[in-house]
Amino acid sequence: MAHSLPTARKLAVVTGTTSGVGLAVARLLLERGWHVLGAARRPSAIEHDGYEHVRVDLSDIDSLGTELASRLTALLGSRTLARVGLVNNAADPGLLGPVAALDPRRLAHVFAINVAAPIWLMGTLVRLAPPTAPLRVVNLSTGAAARPFPGLAAYGSSKAALRMAGMALAAEIDSTPDPTLRQRDIALLSYEPGTVDTPMQAWARSQPPAVLPSRDLFLRFEAERLLVPPTAPARDIASFLEADRAPRFQERRLGT
């Protein structure tokens, strides 16, 4: 579907906007006057003049290079943009089980969604965003990226890889011989939203212990009412996207 260029001067690209944190972030940014380009496999429930949705399978590299790439090129080419944001929220936690039993094809699928697509999006926005517009990038992380959880090797290691990709991009910008790139206002955040009440949590609680030995932890989160609504991390993320000067790279967790 053809779209006109937005009148808003702030553009955010958010993946996984059909539920959970991604949906909450998109709605909050729209309330704050952003134009939001959402990307997800399923249709979006958001109905707002400032929102447009691209249905895309982030594991399909070819689809990234067609409709999503062309729309990003059109949006980021607008000279009226005063701020650009990227929220890499979409993730596939679906490959569970011990390392010795993981299927390499499913591993490739998980890493395509959780690592390859976010890295491609980061590079695309650095390359195409107006150099005078502050660029803020948020990569959603997880406790499983730093702590081992039995049964979550694929998900945790993919999130650890995304964390390192963000750090590497920040180091590249700081060390580049290109003074124009080095002096740009680009900041990256690796953000751990904590225990959020999302479909992913419910899905983890439903798994058999043989597949997810750490299932009891997710059951405890619900039983002890430790789950927070998606709007809580959404506020943190929106605040970072709207922040003035920030460190090139930082890590934060909900409530810190």
Residues covered by each model-derived region:
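N-terminal Rossmann NAD(P)H-binding glycine-rich loop of SDR-like oxidoreductase domains
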Residues: 18, 26
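Catalytic loop of short-chain dehydrogenase/reductase
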Residues: 136-182, 192-195, 205
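Conserved internal alpha-helix within the Rossmann fold of NAD(P)-dependent oxidoreductases
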Residues: 117-122, 146, 237
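Catalytic Tyr-X3-Lys loop
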Residues: 92, 100-119, 162
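Rossmann-fold cofactor-recognition segment
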Residues: 49-62
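Conserved glycine-rich Rossmann-like NAD(P)H-binding loop of the short-chain dehydrogenase/reductase
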Residues: 32-47
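Conserved NAD(P)H cofactor-binding loop of Rossmann-fold oxidoreductase domains
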Residues: 87-96
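C-terminal helical subdomain
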Residues: 182, 186, 190-191, 198, ...
